[in-house]
């Protein structure tokens, strides 16, 4: 049932930390590539809460709701009330997709830009894997180390 609400999921490997240099004390920009879908990602992570190192593998999922039945999120957190998608992951952020761009050529690429309260994500790769996202869509990012 949960797989129906997940819009994107893949296993990533951390390639580099802070590729453009360290900008913030408690935030690290993670550069990672995915195993199955050959996606590229930059993701800002609060590494004081969720530390990552080069070579770490993690599952990353994007979903519009945490409710397993697919109902929209109410915006209120009630601990222990019912099982949610968050129960299967270790690090969760909520944000808004603010930009989608596509580039044509020999190998077309699509890019998603999401802001999680100022922590940013760029997800780049084959347009077929990210064509079902919509501009201004609210998304949950869910991560779990492998």
From Swiss-Prot:
Nucleus in keyword set: yes
GO terms under cellular component: RNA polymerase II, core complex; RNA polymerase V complex
Listed InterPro entries: NA-bd_OB-fold, RPABC3
Disulfide bond positions: none
Signal peptide interval: none
Keyword Manganese set for record: no
Subcellular location: Nucleus
Annotated Pfam families: RNA_pol_Rpb8
Keywords: Nucleus
GO MF terms held by the record: DNA-directed RNA polymerase activity
Main location: nucleus
GO biological process: DNA-templated transcription
Family, per entry: Belongs to the eukaryotic RPB8 RNA polymerase subunit family.
PANTHER family reported in the protein's UniProt record: DNA-DIRECTED RNA POLYMERASES I, II, AND III SUBUNIT RPABC3 (PTHR10917:SF0)
Function in brief: DNA-dependent RNA polymerase catalyzes the transcription of DNA into RNA using the four ribonucleoside triphosphates as substrates. Component of RNA polymerase II which synthesizes mRNA precursors and many functional non-coding RNAs. Pol II is the central component of the basal RNA polymerase II transcription machinery. It is composed of mobile elements that move relative to each other. Component of RNA polymerase V which mediates RNA-directed DNA methylation-dependent (RdDM) transcriptional gene silencing (TGS) of endogenous repeated sequences, including transposable elements.
Binding partners and assembly: Component of the RNA polymerase II and V complexes. Associates with the mediator complex.
Protein name listed in UniProt: DNA-directed RNA polymerases II and V subunit 8A
Species of origin: Arabidopsis thaliana (Mouse-ear cress)
């Amino acid at each position: 049932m949960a797989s129906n609400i997940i819009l994107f999921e893949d296993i990533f490997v951390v390639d580099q930390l802070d590729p453009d240099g360290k900008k913030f004390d408690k935030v690290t920009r993670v550069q990672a590539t995915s195993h199955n879908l050959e996606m590229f990602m930059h993701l800002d992570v609060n590494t004081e809460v969720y530390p990552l190192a080069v070579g770490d593998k993690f599952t990353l999922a994007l979903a519009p709701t945490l409710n397993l039945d697919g109902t929209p999120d109410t915006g209120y957190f009630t601990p222990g009330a019912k099982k949610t998608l968050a129960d299967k992951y270790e690090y969760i952020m909520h944000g808004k997709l603010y930009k989608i761009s596509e580039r044509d050529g020999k190998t077309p690429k699509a890019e998603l830009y999401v802001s999680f309260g100022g922590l940013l994500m760029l997800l780049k790769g084959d347009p077929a894997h990210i064509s079902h996202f919509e501009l201004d869509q609210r998304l949950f990012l869910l991560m779990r180390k492998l």
